[in-house]
Amino acid sequence: MSDPRYPIGKFSYTGPLTAEQKQQYLTDIEQTPSRLRAAVRGLSDQQLNTPYRDGGWTPRQVAHHVADSHMNSYIRFKLALTEDEPTIKPYMENLWAELPEAKHAPIEVSLALLDSLHQRWMLMLREFTGAEWKRAFRHPDLGPMSLEKTLALYSWHGRHHVAHVTSLREKMGW
């Protein structure tokens, strides 16, 4: 049986990306809000509060996490575009997911945020001509991260978390 933590597999980057790969990853990022919205559509509060696996997050926590994570990524892109390889501050995503608002807030709050955030993010990304993809930030644990690699990562990240919700729905017959 495959690992339920990674329903689409672990992230892998073999860069540099082809033009076709970049286009696909841009499309993935652009569609993350609508894909997540479709994945959670019609779920009851009880279903939204059901972990996708033992010890895993609930669809509610997943929705709030994707908003938290993608806000951080958007800011990291801006930092990398305006500073020379800035060192970013990581955040404790598992602890953020345990905060009361991540466990109880209506998911529409984060879905609406993602809609607006991704519109802004795509306006930025669609303007990239070439050199911007090579710009980077430094992650204290992972080292330098080019914006090209980060594009691939967040394409995967959105699909990964949507798959958490859709695999739960499939498993539970929802």
PLM feature spans:
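Short, contiguous alpha-helical
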Residues: 1-8, 12-14, 49-94, 119-123, ...
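Short, contiguous, helix-prone interaction/anchoring segments in small proteins
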Residues: 20-53
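Solvent-exposed interaction patches of small proteins and small membrane subunits
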Residues: 17-27, 83, 104-105, 112, ...
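Generic anion/oxyanion-binding catalytic loop in active/binding sites
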Residues: 25, 51, 99, 110, ...
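Acidic/histidine-rich alpha-helical segments that form the ligand environment
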Residues: 28-39, 96-134
